[in-house]
């Protein structure tokens, strides 16, 4: 990837991630639903522009991602949802000219009455509205199209495969969604090792972290089955390089956790060195835990060969 493309992708990712994946509800309840999860909330998913913001928001629909609408102009009843929201939940707000991705459900009516056409509520309350930024909105729209396409598959295996393939996308929001789903459903497999290895050098800390977490799941499964992952030694050296040299303490700590999962006694020496010399307390702590695990599971006399602290991966 060229420096210009990488810089552009990094800037776009930072801009969109701040407003989307770490939105106001993350602070309100500790963990917000992901963009992927939000798109699954409603039977209808659209992108639209707010034309009026009174008791009901009048929205001009610009694009329909999922479902069908009786009209290109829809009315959204949101004031009642604001009244009923839980403590700490942010208010739903609409502003003139604002563009949003909206997850919708038809407005409920009294039993026996006919639902009024083109009247909706937000599915998931405040999580049913994702505002489009002034810059980078096309990346968000592209992500919505792709994710809804995956979610619409009827075969669960096809959905899982589509989620894995998100890691190959250039759009960082799709990559982020891919990592979230792969980790949630433990979809990592040996075929993904070359792709995941490339993410160990990605400029985004979150992608390096996520790739290490997927590796931990893959190595854990391999260890439980008692089989050796193809290319496992090369992979361990790559992860060890991250543990020693990544600029992020959080990433280094995760690399240590991932190495611990491999259960290799020959990591004792390097873990001892990291436990005593890494500048970060959290990394030293994780290395100490890994060292304790190694010493508990394997007597020192049975070390065999070791990964030398001076060996260059």
State what each model feature region is.
Residues 183, 216-220, 260, 292:
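Structural signature of alpha-helical solenoid repeat scaffolds
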Residues 155-166, 188-200, 221-243, 264-276, ...:
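Amphipathic alpha-helical scaffolding segments comprising HEAT/armadillo-like alpha-solenoid repeats
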Residues 81-174, 187-188:
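Extracellular C-terminal loop/segment signatures of secreted glycoproteins
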Residues 41-63:
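Structural detector for short beta-strands of small beta-barrel domains
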Residues 178-179, 211, 255, 287:
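Conserved hydrophobic register position within alpha-solenoid helical repeats
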Residues 2-13:
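Bacterial N-terminal signal peptides that target proteins for export
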Residues 28-43:
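Short boundary/loop segments of OB/S1/cold-shock single-stranded nucleic-acid-binding domains
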Residues 172-173, 205-209, 233, 247-250, ...:
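Alpha-helix N-cap/helix-start positions at coil->helix boundaries
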């Amino acid at each position: 990837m060229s420096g210009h493309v990488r810089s552009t992708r990094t800037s776009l990712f930072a801009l969109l991630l701040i407003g989307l994946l770490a939105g106001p509800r993350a602070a309100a309840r500790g963990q917000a639903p992901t963009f992927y999860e939000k798109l699954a909330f409603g039977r209808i998913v659209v992108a639209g522009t707010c034309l009026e913001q009174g008791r009901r928001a009048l929205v001009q629909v610009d694009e329909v991602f999922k479902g069908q609408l009786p009209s290109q102009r829809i009315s959204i009843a949101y004031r009642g949802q604001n009244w009923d929201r839980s403590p700490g939940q942010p208010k739903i707000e609409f502003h003139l000219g604002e563009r949003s991705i909206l997850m919708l459900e038809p407005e409920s009516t009294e039993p026996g009455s006919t639902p009024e056409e083109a009247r909706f509520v937000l599915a998931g309350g405040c999580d049913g509205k994702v505002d489009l930024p002034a810059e980078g909105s096309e990346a968000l729209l592209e992500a919505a199209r792709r994710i809804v396409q995956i979610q619409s598959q009827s075969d669960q295996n096809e959905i899982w495969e589509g989620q894995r393939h998100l890691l190959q996308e250039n759009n960082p929001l799709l990559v982020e969604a891919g990592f979230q789903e792969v980790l949630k459903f433990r979809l990592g497999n040996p075929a993904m090792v070359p792709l995941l290895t490339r993410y160990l050098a990605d400029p985004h800390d979150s992608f390096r972290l996520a790739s290490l977490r997927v590796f931990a799941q893959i190595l854990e499964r391999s260890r439980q089955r008692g089989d050796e992952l193809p290319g496992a030694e090369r992979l361990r050296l790559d992860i060890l390089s991250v543990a020693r040299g990544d600029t992020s303490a959080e990433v280094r700590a995760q690399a240590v956790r991932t190495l611990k999962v491999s259960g290799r006694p020959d990591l004792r020496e390097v873990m001892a060195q990291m436990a005593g010399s890494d500048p970060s307390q959290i990394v030293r702590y994780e290395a100490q835990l890994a060292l304790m695990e190694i010493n508990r599971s394997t007597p020192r006399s049975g070390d065999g060969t070791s990964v030398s602290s001076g060996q260059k991966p």
